[in-house]
Amino acid sequence: MKIKMVLFDLDGTLLPMDQDAFTKGYFKLLAAKVAHRGYEAKALVDGVWAGTAAMVANDGSCTNEEAFWKRFSAIFGERVYADKPIFDEFYRVDFQQARAFCGYNPDAAWAVARIREHGCRVALATNPLFPFFATESRIRWAGLEPEDFELFTTYENSRHCKPNPDYYRDVIAALGVRAEDCLMVGNDADEDMIAETLGMQVFLLTDCLINKKDRDINVWPHGGFAELVKYVCGPLRYR
């Protein structure tokens, strides 16, 4: 089946990372930024996780941004809305230091370029738990530019999260494509490969594999970036 649109995950796919190490480092930076506003570090982290859970559970009745801040304010009170500009500044400025907790693989940008040259459209289907500025930054850390993608999902422009299939339905609706014309590329055997249930083709990138349920990955096309390019473009475009 011809592939017309390739959807890429970001964290652990285009941007190599150990998610636990990244999250620990990122939370430490955030806690330092807002400590002067009275947010104790552990309570802050617990609050962010609660807000994240609210986004993952979002039924589409609001944006993920609204779901996060509603839950966060239920924990810390309405004062969080007055503090929101400080959090926004964190993601624009201080968050850049979190690059130190990520890896880099030049093959990521190479693969995106080859696939675009092959004539495929590309979009970034990253789990929309982060604000726009934090997502733009992580794209650049991967050696790419936001303009390389027709769409990238953020907590501002999304109403569902992975692994909810409605997240993928929203993405293909925004792009005006059919599921069967899409290939979802990601490193998570649950959150990314679930796109297959909508009729999408899938490719499991194994460089930073997440397989919490120990699934048999041989049921999906899988491998590194070289194998991905060969899968999409054919042997003639393989390196």
Segments and roles (model prediction):
Residues 52-66, 95-103, 157-167, 194-201:
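Short amphipathic alpha-helical segments at helix boundaries and their inter-helical linkers
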Residues 63-66, 83-85, 92-123:
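Short, acidic loop-to-helix structural element flanking the phosphoryl-transfer center
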Residues 1-47:
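Active-site neighborhood of HAD-like aspartate-dependent phosphohydrolases
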Residues 125-127:
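A cross-family glycoside hydrolase active-site/sugar-binding cleft signature
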Residues 46-92:
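A metal-dependent, Asp-based hydrolase signature
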Residues 1-6, 109, 113, 129-130, ...:
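Asp-based, Mg2+/Mn2+-dependent phosphohydrolase catalytic module
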